Amino acid sequence: MEMVEEHIKGILKNRKIHFTLIDPDEQTPQEALEIAEEAILGGTDGIMIGGSTVNNDEVDETCKILSENIEVPIILFPGNINSVSKYADAIFFMSYLNSTNPYWIYGAQALAAPIVRQAGIEVLPMGYMVVQPGGTVGWVGDAKLVPRNKPKIPAAYAMSAELLGMRFFYIEAGSGADKPIPPEMVGYTKKATEDMVIIVGGGIRDGEAAYTAAKAGGDIIVTGTVVEETNDVRGKIEEITAAIRKASIE
Protein backbone atom coordinates (compact mmCIF):
# COMPACT_ATOMS: atom_id res chain seq x y z
CA MET A 1 0.00 0.00 0.00
CA GLU A 2 1.22 3.55 -0.77
CA MET A 3 1.96 5.83 2.14
CA VAL A 4 -1.26 6.71 3.93
CA GLU A 5 -0.70 10.48 3.92
CA GLU A 6 -0.01 10.42 0.18
CA HIS A 7 -3.12 8.29 -0.29
CA ILE A 8 -5.25 10.76 1.66
CA LYS A 9 -3.95 13.81 -0.18
CA GLY A 10 -4.35 12.03 -3.50
CA ILE A 11 -8.05 11.50 -2.83
CA LEU A 12 -8.46 15.07 -1.57
CA LYS A 13 -7.36 16.41 -4.95
CA ASN A 14 -10.72 15.18 -6.27
CA ARG A 15 -13.13 14.91 -3.34
CA LYS A 16 -13.67 14.85 0.42
CA ILE A 17 -13.06 11.67 2.46
CA HIS A 18 -15.00 9.51 4.90
CA PHE A 19 -13.44 7.39 7.64
CA THR A 20 -15.23 4.89 9.85
CA LEU A 21 -14.11 4.83 13.49
CA ILE A 22 -14.29 1.47 15.23
CA ASP A 23 -13.85 1.23 19.01
CA PRO A 24 -12.33 -2.18 19.90
CA ASP A 25 -13.87 -1.86 23.36
CA GLU A 26 -17.38 -2.05 21.88
CA GLN A 27 -17.15 -5.28 19.84
CA THR A 28 -15.02 -8.36 19.24
CA PRO A 29 -12.33 -8.34 16.53
CA GLN A 30 -14.57 -10.49 14.31
CA GLU A 31 -17.47 -8.09 14.77
CA ALA A 32 -15.15 -5.19 14.01
CA LEU A 33 -14.15 -6.90 10.76
CA GLU A 34 -17.78 -7.37 9.78
CA ILE A 35 -18.48 -3.69 10.44
CA ALA A 36 -15.40 -2.65 8.46
CA GLU A 37 -16.30 -4.82 5.48
CA GLU A 38 -19.84 -3.43 5.37
CA ALA A 39 -18.55 0.13 5.73
CA ILE A 40 -16.13 -0.41 2.85
CA LEU A 41 -18.98 -1.68 0.68
CA GLY A 42 -20.80 1.51 1.68
CA GLY A 43 -17.94 3.64 0.36
CA THR A 44 -15.80 4.48 3.38
CA ASP A 45 -12.20 5.37 2.53
CA GLY A 46 -10.46 4.09 5.65
CA ILE A 47 -10.87 2.53 9.07
CA MET A 48 -9.79 4.30 12.24
CA ILE A 49 -9.21 2.16 15.32
CA GLY A 50 -9.41 3.67 18.78
CA GLY A 51 -11.35 4.71 21.83
CA SER A 52 -10.91 6.40 25.17
CA THR A 53 -10.63 3.25 27.30
CA VAL A 54 -9.28 0.43 25.10
CA ASN A 55 -6.29 -1.77 25.94
CA ASN A 56 -3.43 -2.99 23.76
CA ASP A 57 -4.71 -6.54 23.29
CA GLU A 58 -8.05 -5.32 21.94
CA VAL A 59 -6.34 -2.90 19.55
CA ASP A 60 -3.75 -5.43 18.40
CA GLU A 61 -6.23 -8.24 17.76
CA THR A 62 -8.61 -5.93 15.91
CA CYS A 63 -5.89 -4.43 13.72
CA LYS A 64 -4.48 -7.87 12.93
CA ILE A 65 -7.73 -9.33 11.65
CA LEU A 66 -8.44 -6.17 9.66
CA SER A 67 -4.97 -6.13 8.10
CA GLU A 68 -5.49 -9.68 6.91
CA ASN A 69 -8.83 -8.99 5.27
CA ILE A 70 -9.26 -5.40 4.04
CA GLU A 71 -7.42 -3.14 1.60
CA VAL A 72 -8.27 0.38 2.81
CA PRO A 73 -5.90 2.11 5.26
CA ILE A 74 -6.08 1.16 8.94
CA ILE A 75 -5.24 4.20 11.05
CA LEU A 76 -4.80 4.19 14.81
CA PHE A 77 -6.66 6.87 16.75
CA PRO A 78 -4.99 6.29 20.12
CA GLY A 79 -6.62 6.91 23.46
CA ASN A 80 -3.35 6.33 25.31
CA ILE A 81 0.09 4.75 24.92
CA ASN A 82 -1.42 1.25 25.02
CA SER A 83 -3.26 1.85 21.73
CA VAL A 84 -0.38 1.10 19.35
CA SER A 85 -0.28 -1.89 17.00
CA LYS A 86 2.25 -2.95 14.38
CA TYR A 87 -0.66 -4.29 12.31
CA ALA A 88 -1.97 -0.78 11.55
CA ASP A 89 -0.84 1.19 8.50
CA ALA A 90 -0.49 4.52 10.30
CA ILE A 91 -1.17 6.37 13.53
CA PHE A 92 -2.59 9.80 14.20
CA PHE A 93 0.25 10.92 16.48
CA MET A 94 -1.63 13.69 18.19
CA SER A 95 -1.47 16.35 20.85
CA TYR A 96 -4.67 17.01 22.80
CA LEU A 97 -4.39 20.76 22.49
CA ASN A 98 -7.17 21.89 24.83
CA SER A 99 -6.44 19.45 27.63
CA THR A 100 -5.56 21.02 30.98
CA ASN A 101 -3.31 18.05 31.75
CA PRO A 102 0.26 18.16 30.34
CA TYR A 103 0.19 14.38 30.06
CA TRP A 104 -2.28 14.55 27.16
CA ILE A 105 -0.57 17.50 25.50
CA TYR A 106 2.91 15.98 25.30
CA GLY A 107 3.57 13.48 28.10
CA ALA A 108 1.82 10.50 26.52
CA GLN A 109 3.47 11.31 23.21
CA ALA A 110 6.94 11.14 24.73
CA LEU A 111 6.15 7.78 26.31
CA ALA A 112 4.60 6.44 23.12
CA ALA A 113 7.29 7.61 20.70
CA PRO A 114 9.65 4.62 21.21
CA ILE A 115 6.70 2.23 20.91
CA VAL A 116 5.57 3.83 17.65
CA ARG A 117 9.10 3.78 16.24
CA GLN A 118 9.47 0.11 17.14
CA ALA A 119 6.13 -0.71 15.50
CA GLY A 120 7.40 0.81 12.27
CA ILE A 121 4.10 2.39 11.26
CA GLU A 122 3.59 5.67 9.44
CA VAL A 123 3.11 8.75 11.62
CA LEU A 124 0.48 11.39 10.83
CA PRO A 125 1.15 14.41 13.11
CA MET A 126 -2.13 15.87 14.32
CA GLY A 127 -3.55 18.54 16.58
CA TYR A 128 -6.68 17.41 18.40
CA MET A 129 -9.37 19.59 19.95
CA VAL A 130 -12.65 18.70 21.66
CA VAL A 131 -15.72 20.94 21.57
CA GLN A 132 -18.72 20.85 23.90
CA PRO A 133 -20.26 18.49 24.98
CA GLY A 134 -17.04 16.44 24.77
CA GLY A 135 -18.33 13.04 25.91
CA THR A 136 -15.98 10.46 27.39
CA VAL A 137 -12.91 11.81 25.61
CA GLY A 138 -13.51 15.23 27.13
CA TRP A 139 -13.73 13.78 30.63
CA VAL A 140 -10.81 11.37 30.30
CA GLY A 141 -8.64 14.01 28.65
CA ASP A 142 -9.27 16.73 31.25
CA ALA A 143 -10.35 19.07 28.47
CA LYS A 144 -11.22 22.72 28.71
CA LEU A 145 -14.05 22.20 26.26
CA VAL A 146 -14.46 24.79 23.52
CA PRO A 147 -17.85 26.56 23.69
CA ARG A 148 -19.93 25.84 20.61
CA ASN A 149 -20.49 29.55 19.97
CA LYS A 150 -16.77 30.41 19.82
CA PRO A 151 -15.65 29.34 16.31
CA LYS A 152 -12.45 31.38 16.34
CA ILE A 153 -10.91 29.41 19.22
CA PRO A 154 -10.26 26.15 17.31
CA ALA A 155 -9.26 28.24 14.28
CA ALA A 156 -6.47 29.84 16.31
CA TYR A 157 -5.37 26.47 17.69
CA ALA A 158 -5.35 24.97 14.19
CA MET A 159 -3.23 27.84 12.93
CA SER A 160 -0.73 27.37 15.75
CA ALA A 161 -0.67 23.60 15.20
CA GLU A 162 0.16 24.15 11.54
CA LEU A 163 2.96 26.55 12.45
CA LEU A 164 4.33 23.88 14.80
CA GLY A 165 4.49 21.46 11.87
CA MET A 166 1.35 19.38 12.37
CA ARG A 167 -0.33 18.41 9.11
CA PHE A 168 -3.71 17.24 10.39
CA PHE A 169 -6.21 18.89 12.72
CA TYR A 170 -9.12 16.98 14.26
CA ILE A 171 -12.01 18.92 15.75
CA GLU A 172 -14.71 16.89 17.40
CA ALA A 173 -17.66 17.00 19.75
CA GLY A 174 -16.98 13.63 21.38
CA SER A 175 -18.21 10.14 20.60
CA GLY A 176 -21.98 9.91 20.71
CA ALA A 177 -22.49 13.69 20.89
CA ASP A 178 -26.07 14.78 20.35
CA LYS A 179 -25.01 17.54 17.93
CA PRO A 180 -22.16 17.75 15.40
CA ILE A 181 -19.57 20.53 15.29
CA PRO A 182 -21.18 23.84 14.21
CA PRO A 183 -20.43 24.49 10.52
CA GLU A 184 -19.21 28.02 11.31
CA MET A 185 -16.53 26.51 13.53
CA VAL A 186 -15.42 24.12 10.79
CA GLY A 187 -15.33 26.97 8.27
CA TYR A 188 -13.24 29.28 10.44
CA THR A 189 -10.81 26.45 11.17
CA LYS A 190 -10.36 25.57 7.50
CA LYS A 191 -9.85 29.19 6.45
CA ALA A 192 -7.30 29.77 9.22
CA THR A 193 -4.93 27.14 7.83
CA GLU A 194 -3.09 26.79 4.54
CA ASP A 195 -2.36 23.13 3.87
CA MET A 196 -3.74 21.28 6.90
CA VAL A 197 -6.16 18.40 6.49
CA ILE A 198 -9.19 19.25 8.63
CA ILE A 199 -10.95 16.27 10.21
CA VAL A 200 -14.43 16.60 11.70
CA GLY A 201 -16.18 14.07 13.93
CA GLY A 202 -18.67 13.58 16.73
CA GLY A 203 -22.44 13.73 16.43
CA ILE A 204 -22.56 12.96 12.70
CA ARG A 205 -25.25 10.34 12.24
CA ASP A 206 -26.77 10.97 8.82
CA GLY A 207 -26.12 12.29 5.35
CA GLU A 208 -27.36 15.78 6.13
CA ALA A 209 -24.89 16.27 8.99
CA ALA A 210 -22.05 14.80 6.92
CA TYR A 211 -22.91 17.08 3.99
CA THR A 212 -22.93 20.12 6.26
CA ALA A 213 -19.54 19.27 7.79
CA ALA A 214 -17.93 18.64 4.40
CA LYS A 215 -19.48 21.70 2.78
CA ALA A 216 -18.29 23.88 5.66
CA GLY A 217 -14.68 22.88 5.07
CA GLY A 218 -14.10 19.45 6.58
CA ASP A 219 -11.68 17.40 4.47
CA ILE A 220 -12.27 14.12 6.30
CA ILE A 221 -15.58 13.31 7.95
CA VAL A 222 -15.49 10.66 10.68
CA THR A 223 -18.42 8.62 11.93
CA GLY A 224 -18.23 5.99 14.64
CA THR A 225 -21.22 5.63 16.95
CA VAL A 226 -23.58 5.35 13.98
CA VAL A 227 -22.12 1.99 12.89
CA GLU A 228 -22.64 0.64 16.40
CA GLU A 229 -26.26 1.77 16.50
CA THR A 230 -27.53 0.81 13.04
CA ASN A 231 -28.64 -2.60 11.80
CA ASP A 232 -27.65 -1.63 8.25
CA VAL A 233 -24.03 -0.46 8.30
CA ARG A 234 -23.63 -0.53 4.53
CA GLY A 235 -26.82 1.44 3.90
CA LYS A 236 -26.04 4.08 6.51
CA ILE A 237 -22.47 4.55 5.28
CA GLU A 238 -23.72 4.76 1.68
CA GLU A 239 -26.03 7.58 2.77
CA ILE A 240 -23.18 9.42 4.47
CA THR A 241 -20.55 8.93 1.76
CA ALA A 242 -22.98 9.98 -0.96
CA ALA A 243 -23.63 13.21 0.93
CA ILE A 244 -19.90 13.86 1.33
CA ARG A 245 -19.32 13.31 -2.38
CA LYS A 246 -22.19 15.67 -3.17
CA ALA A 247 -20.59 18.35 -1.00
CA SER A 248 -17.30 17.77 -2.82
CA ILE A 249 -18.67 18.74 -6.24
CA GLU A 250 -21.02 21.57 -5.34
UniProtKB/Swiss-Prot annotation:
Its cofactor is Mg(2+). Mg(2+) binds at D23, S52. Sn-glycerol 1-phosphate binds at Y170, I171, E172, A173, G174, S175, G176, G202, G203, G224, T225. GO terms for molecular function: magnesium ion binding; phosphoglycerol geranylgeranyltransferase activity. It catalyses: sn-glycerol 1-phosphate + (2E,6E,10E)-geranylgeranyl diphosphate = sn-3-O-(geranylgeranyl)glycerol 1-phosphate + diphosphate. Keywords: Cytoplasm, Lipid biosynthesis, Lipid metabolism, Magnesium, Metal-binding, Phospholipid biosynthesis, Phospholipid metabolism, Transferase. Belongs to the GGGP/HepGP synthase family. Group II subfamily. This is Geranylgeranylglyceryl phosphate synthase. It comes from Methanobrevibacter smithii (strain ATCC 35061 / DSM 861 / OCM 144 / PS).
